[in-house]
A protein has these predicted regions:
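Short glycine/proline-enriched turns and hinge-like loops at secondary-structure junctions
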Residues: 78-80, 153
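Repetitive beta-architecture junctions, highlighting loop-to-beta-strand starts
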Residues: 31-33, 42, 80-84, 92, ...
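Short loop/turn segments that connect beta-strands within beta-propeller blades
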Residues: 38-41, 88-92, 132-134
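Blade-edge beta-strand/turn elements of extracellular beta-propeller
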Residues: 42-49, 92-99
Length: 166
């Protein structure tokens, strides 16, 4: 599943300032972003690549030529954990902005200079931190306390792996 971050949905975004189209495709069996010239239809280049996938576009800064997106399967560990990345539209320089090995939910400030990063795993309760636009942690906003749950006898789930037939 891919979320273009646009109300109309779809697997593409038009970049009006550069007359380009950003297109999501699984042409190599992995979900990645490609940049096309909107006038000629010529592929200008891949924006992302590798054995992982882009899941959701969060924002595009056409002036800076940068794109923020959620991806999964790139970092070691659980391939379903979602991380926030930033990538250059022209150079493909990829930066991981949420390094903790967990599933991340992101909320940007109106200025986009900061974002809240709420992350957790099936066995680790949610933590919310404030990060600057480059992903540096500024402060912990909240840590979920599950001590009352544990004291009542509740047990954490036990992760397991099952080998697939294929």
């Amino acid at each position: 599943f891919f979320d273009s971050g646009h109300e109309a949905g779809g697997n593409w975004r038009f970049l009006s300032s550069s007359n380009e189209v950003l297109w999501y495709s699984q042409r190599d069996d992995w979900g990645h972003l490609y940049l096309y010239d909107a006038e000629t239809g010529v592929l200008k280049g891949r924006v992302t690549e590798g054995e992982w996938q882009v899941a959701e576009i969060i924002r595009i800064d056409e002036g800076e030529r940068k794109l923020w997106f959620i991806g999964n399967g790139r970092e070691s560990g659980d391939p379903y954990f979602r991380y926030l990345y930033r990538v250059g539209l022209d150079d493909g320089e990829l930066e991981l902005l949420t390094p903790d090995s967990a599933n991340h939910t992101i909320s940007f400030s109106p200025s986009r200079a900061y974002f809240l990063d709420s992350y957790s795993t099936p066995v680790d309760p949610p933590v919310t931190v404030l990060r600057d636009g480059d992903g540096a942690e500024i402060m912990t906003v909240q840590e979920t306390d599950i001590s009352a749950l544990l004291a009542s006898g509740w047990q954490l789930p036990i992760p397991f792996s099952v080998k697939a037939r294929d």
